[in-house]
């Protein structure tokens, strides 16, 4: 009887080893494919909202959109857990209209809102305003002259003025004043957390601790503040993203965006005057508005405040706080055309 060498006969161990190696290799390959698919899904989440994506593409272009996507990936750990505050939460809308000139604005706290409210009141009824208000800057929000007269909480009201008397047959012109996100946050912080100390639990009890305020507000923006039935705080009103206001998911392209720059109010007024002049508003009215706006600042302005400069330096010099800032206002930066800060 023919006998084979033992190493040729007993091959079961080698076969098992080969099968195990093949199985392990296959498992690793499929695991890699799985993670690649998850990563693709994660990166595609940046473009998942078609309407938002179309707005971003309009504002940023392809190259800018790619830069924004890379920052998005840095700030989001996974598909199910993203630390960026979402845009377009239906929070609050405050429309002021001047039907005679087919002009409206939606005001956002800390974006020259007191002045824009007064300007729209002036345009709503020029004669009545001139006869009753002699200092536009003193026409402050709590006791404003047009309270309840030309103010609405939805843009749908513009449809009701379609047949009102007007100097022009032009469609409605809608203005949205926006502000650089860090500048706006600092203005709100100094106004509400440093100067205004009489309220209960002011700024979440953080006092002048800006890191504490940012952390507490971020927590609210990622949670309860997104719920429409929740009573929003004064802090929410001043610190919520600008994209949460004015029904922007549906109305973004309807607005002409004007950037507020507190260091150069005159330049902003030049732009605003150009738009208003096109609505048939006389030069005498525009000249009066400019004169009153530039005469002095509102009482809650924080421009040139020494503490504000200190807090700005604190935020800018802290990688942690700058990252937190971008997570809070990522979409404000992108949609309103402000450079996205570099984060570590």
Give the location of each predicted region.
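Membrane-interface amphipathic segments in extracytoplasmic regions
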Residues: 2-344
């Amino acid at each position: 009887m023919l006998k084979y060498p033992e190493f040729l006969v007993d091959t079961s161990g080698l076969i098992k080893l080969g099968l195990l190696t093949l199985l392990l290799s296959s498992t690793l390959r499929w695991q890699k494919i799985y993670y690649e698919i998850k990563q693709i899904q994660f990166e595609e989440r940046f473009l998942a909202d078609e309407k938002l994506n179309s707005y971003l593409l309009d504002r940023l272009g392809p190259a800018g959109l790619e830069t924004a996507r890379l920052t998005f990936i840095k700030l989001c750990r996974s598909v199910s857990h993203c630390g960026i505050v979402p845009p377009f939460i239906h929070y609050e809308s405050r429309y002021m209209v001047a039907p005679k000139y087919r002009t409206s604005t939606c005001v956002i706290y800390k974006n020259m809102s007191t002045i824009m409210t007064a300007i729209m009141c002036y345009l709503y009824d020029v004669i009545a305003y001139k006869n009753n208000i002699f200092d536009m800057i003193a026409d402050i929000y709590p006791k404003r002259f047009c309270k309840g007269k030309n103010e609405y909480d939805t843009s749908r009201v513009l449809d009701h003025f379609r047949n009102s008397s007007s100097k022009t047959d032009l469609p409605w012109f809608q203005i949205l004043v926006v502000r650089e996100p860090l500048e706006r946050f600092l203005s709100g912080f100094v106004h509400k957390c440093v100067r205004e100390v009489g309220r209960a639990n002011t700024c979440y009890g953080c006092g002048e601790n800006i890191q504490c305020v940012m952390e507490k507000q971020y927590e609210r923006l990622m949670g309860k503040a997104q719920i429409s039935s929740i009573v929003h705080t004064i802090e929410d009103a001043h610190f919520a993203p600008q994209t949460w206001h004015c029904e922007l998911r549906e109305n973004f392209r309807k607005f002409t965006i004007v950037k507020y720059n507190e260091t150069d109010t005159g330049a902003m007024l030049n732009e605003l005057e150009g738009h208003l002049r096109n609505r048939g508003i006389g030069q005498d009215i525009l000249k009066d508005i400019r004169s009153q706006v530039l005469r002095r600042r509102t009482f809650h302005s924080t421009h040139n405040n020494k503490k504000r400069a200190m807090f700005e330096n604190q935020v800018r010099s802290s990688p942690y706080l700058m990252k937190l800032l971008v997570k809070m206002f990522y979409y404000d930066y992108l949609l309103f055309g402000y450079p996205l800060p570099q984060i570590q």
